[in-house]
């Protein structure tokens, strides 16, 4: 019996082991070599308008003197943010906060797809899509709309006609009911794997993305036949999926 997975395996902020830090180029590359189909990252504007890959409104790291520094991303220029050291001793050397462009360039050369969380919402839709175009990643990006709905979809598709989209649960599903291609392009993400919730998303005609997965909740999630499985950055998704597929072969 030939068993294979039919879902997208996504590593939330990469895959962290040892001294690696989330949302670093090393964490994203580690996700790639462990077999991820996709990585998830975040896009925020620095004070000078550069898209930075950082989850929180603040960025934390070490300066070149080894001192701990916390910066408000929106109030700090990119040069300062990208000089902050995330880790000094991981297997790929010193890691600093990356720009979105650096993340997309890595994805281009590794074949990864990317889920980009637009932390600035609609304001970031056009700039992020233009960066995706610049980096040769058209058709390989899922845009997390952060509530920008059909307005965001239309703006992005004018630049990236093969774009896919993701947002939270049934609220997003309801907001895209006029979008004829939602069944191919729109993922609803949720950590609620109940039949009621999953069926509601399916009934709206959207794709299902289950998030925050680890070894404890994966099997209950995969029973719902998701289109995307997004794993926590500390989850060994490769081992989890291999163990599951071995069990399937025994049925």
How does the language model describe each region?
Residues 1-251:
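Phosphate-group recognition and catalysis centered on beta-loop-alpha active-site segments
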């Amino acid at each position: 019996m030939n068993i294979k997975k039919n879902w997208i395996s996504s590593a939330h902020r990469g895959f962290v082991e040892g001294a690696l830090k989330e949302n670093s180029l090393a964490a994203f590359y580690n996700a790639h070599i462990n077999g991820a189909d996709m990585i998830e990252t975040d896009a925020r504007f620095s004070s000078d308008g550069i898209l930075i890959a950082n989850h929180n409104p603040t960025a934390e790291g070490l300066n070149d003197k080894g001192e701990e520094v916390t910066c408000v991303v929106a109030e700090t220029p990119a040069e300062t943010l990208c000089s902050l050291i995330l880790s000094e001793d991981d297997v790929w050397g010193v890691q600093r906060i990356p720009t979105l462009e650096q993340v997309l360039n890595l994805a281009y050369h590794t074949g990864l797809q990317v889920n980009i969380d637009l932390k600035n919402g609609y304001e970031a839709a056009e700039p992020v899509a233009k960066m995706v175009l610049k980096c040769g990643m058209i058709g390989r990006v899922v845009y997390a709309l952060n509530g920008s709905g059909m307005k965001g979809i239309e703006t992005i598709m004018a630049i990236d006609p093969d774009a896919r989209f993701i947002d939270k649960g049934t609220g997003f599903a309801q907001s895209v009911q006029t979008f004829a291609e939602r069944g191919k392009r729109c993922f609803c993400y949720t950590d609620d794997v109940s039949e009621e919730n999953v069926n509601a998303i399916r009934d709206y005609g959207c794709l299902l993305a289950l998030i925050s997965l680890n070894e404890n909740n994966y099997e209950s999630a995969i029973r719902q036949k998701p289109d995307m499985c997004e794993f926590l950055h500390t989850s060994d998704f490769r081992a989890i999926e291999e163990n599951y597929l071995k069990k399937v072969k025994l049925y």
